[in-house]
Design a protein with these regions (language model features):
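N-terminal cap/lid segment of alpha/beta-hydrolase-fold proteins
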Residues: 1-23
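The serine-hydrolase catalytic nucleophile loop
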Residues: 36-49
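Conserved alpha/beta-hydrolase
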Residues: 49-70
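Catalytic nucleophile-loop/oxyanion-hole region of alpha/beta-hydrolase
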Residues: 66-93
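Hydrolase active-site cap/lid region
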Residues: 114-163, 175, 180
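Short beta-strand/loop motif that positions the catalytic acidic residue
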Residues: 177-178, 184-186, 190
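Conserved alpha/beta-hydrolase "acid-adjacent" motif
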Residues: 191-197
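Catalytic histidine-centered segment of alpha/beta-hydrolase-like enzymes
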Residues: 217-228
C-alpha cells in the first residue's frame, strides 16, 4: 500500500499534515479526521487507514496542534479551516469525496461540511458530540481510564490553545447537511461522549441518514481497535453505498479521464 506524506496550508497560516494512501486511480477519496489527542500517526489510525484503502484512496489528516501539523488546537473553534484545506486538496484530484470523523473530529466534520454539503458525497460521524459543552467525560470511571490508557499510543498528543473560543454546535449544523448521506456510529459504553449525543444528532439530521449503535462499544477509534473487522465492514458498506458512482456516472467519468 503506497503512502505519501503531504502538507496543505490553511487560510490562517497553519500547515496541515496528511498522509495519502493510494494512487488516485479511481477518482474516490475518504478523509479521516481523528479526534482530540489522536493522530494519523498512531498505530490504530495507520491500521484503520490501510484497512479502508483499496476501494478508494484515504487521506488521513492531523488537525492543528496534533502530529506534524503546526499551530495550537482550539477544540473545534478554528479547526474547520484545516479540514477545508484538505477538502480543497482532494477536490482537484478526486470526483467523489467522503469524510469519516471521530469524536471532536466528527464535530469539526459536521460543522465544516454543513457549510459546503455539495462538496462531499458521504459523511460518517463516530462518537460525535452534539455540543462541546455537553461532553460528559467521566474520567474517574474504570472504563474511562481503560479508554484513556489505550489511547496513549506513540504519536498521540496535543499542543492545546485557547479552549474558551466560541464554537459552532453540531446539533445546530446537522440539519444543514441535507441532502448529504450521513452515518452516525456510537458505542453504548462511551463514557467520554455519551450515546445520547448521536441520538440527538440523528434526530436533528435529515434523510438520508442512519444510526448504528454498537452494544458494549467504547469511544471513537476504540471501536476500530476493539473490533477492526466489524468497524471496517460497517464503514466500507456505507461508503460503498454512498460513494460508488451510478453506472451512467461511471461512463461519464471514464470519458472525462480519456479527455485529460
Amino acid at each position: 500500500m503506497n503512502c505519501s506524506a503531504q502538507t496543505v496550508s490553511t487560510n490562517d497560516g497553519v500547515n496541515v499534515s496528511l498522509d495519502l494512501y493510494g494512487q488516485g486511480a479511481h477518482g474516490t477519496a475518504v478523509i479521516i479526521c481523528p479526534g482530540f489527542f489522536q493522530s494519523k500517526d498512531t498505530v490504530t489510525f495507520q491500521r484503520m487507514s490501510r484497512a479502508l484503502a483499496g476501494r478508494f484512496d484515504v487521506l488521513a489528516m492531523d488537525f492543528r496542534g496534533h502530529g506534524k501539523s503546526s499551530g495550537l488546537y482550539t477544540f473545534s473553534a478554528r479547526e474547520g479551516a484545516d479540514l477545508e484545506a484538505v477538502l480543497a486538496f482532494a477536490r482537484v484530484r478526486y470526483q467523489r469525496i467522503g469524510v469519516v470523523g471521530f469524536s471532536l473530529g466528527a464535530a469539526i466534520a459536521i460543522n465544516t461540511v454543513s457549510r459546503h454539503p455539495d462538496q462531499v458525497r458521504s459523511l460518517i460521524a463516530v462518537s460525535a458530540p452534539s455540543t462541546f459543552e455537553q461532553i460528559e467525560f467521566k474520567w474517574w470511571t474504570p472504563e474511562a481510564m481503560r479508554t484513556g490508557m489505550q489511547g496513549l499510543e506513540p504519536g498521540a498528543g496535543c499542543r492545546p490553545g485557547n479552549p474558551l473560543l466560541k464554537k459552532a454546535r453540531p446539533i445546530e449544523r446537522a440539519p444543514r447537511l441535507a441532502p448529504l448521506p450521513i452515518l452516525f456510529i456510537h458505542g453504548t459504553r462511551d463514557v467520554i461522549v455519551g450515546v445520547e449525543h448521536s441520538r440527538r444528532l440523528f434526530a436533528a439530521a435529515s434523510e438520508p441518514k442512519r444510526l448504528e449503535i454498537i452494544e458494549g462499544g467504547s469511544h471513537a477509534e476504540a471501536l476500530f481497535r476493539d473490533d477492526p473487522q466489524r468497524f471496517s465492514d460497517l464503514v466500507n458498506e456505507w461508503l460503498a453505498q454512498t460513494l460508488d458512482p451510478a453506472p451512467q456516472s461511471r461512463k461519464t467519468e471514464r470519458k472525462n479521464r480519456k479527455k485529460l
